[in-house]
A protein has these predicted regions:
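Hydrophobic, aromatic-enriched alpha-helical segments typical of multi-pass transmembrane helices
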Residues: 2-166
């Protein structure tokens, strides 16, 4: 390891691992729901559409994702600290890819939690079919909006893989 401060490196890794735990807890809140035979897709689930899923859970999911994303940043710092200083372009690419990963994770947490909230809120109020249509339309509209977040990361990684940036 090339880092001058191994205790700080370990500290950053621990903070990043805790951040991953927060993000996993948010995912667990969304994923651990009772399933029915009629459930299909991510949000066409009776538990959401009946209003049984607590409206506070998607809000907590976003909060856990935000805290997790913030703490995961320390893993990005730890990985960056281990790259030799003479490889400055590589360090920059790795750092930017790490930041884009955190931004994408937080965006996806927010997006998925919002759809769960919409399904839970709208299901009992406007009916199951209308709620499914609304959530599906939201999902279809948001996916193209999220995809550009991946472009800088792919471009940076493609440049790094090409060898010119090392």
């Amino acid at each position: 390891m090339k880092t001058e401060k191994p205790k700080q490196f370990i500290h950053w890794c621990i903070l990043g691992a805790v951040g991953c735990g927060f993000m996993a807890a948010g995912d667990w809140l969304l994923g651990c729901i009772p399933l029915q035979e009629t459930d299909t897709g991510l949000f066409n689930r009776a538990y959401y559409l009946s209003g049984s899923y607590g409206l506070w859970k998607p809000v907590l999911t976003v909060g856990l994702g935000a805290i997790g994303g913030f703490l995961y940043y320390f893993v990005v710092k730890a990985l960056n600290a281990d790259i030799d200083a003479k490889c400055q372009k590589t360090k920059t690419i790795q750092f930017l890819c790490g930041i884009f990963t955190v931004a994408i994770a937080l965006t996806i947490h927010t997006w998925v939690a919002t759809m769960a909230w919409f399904a839970t809120y709208l299901g009992p109020r406007i009916g199951v079919e209308a709620a499914i249509a609304a959530v599906t339309a939201y999902q279809d509209d948001m996916l193209p909006a999220i995809l550009p977040l991946y472009l800088p990361k792919f471009c940076l990684q493609a440049g790094l893989a090409g060898g010119e940036l090392i």
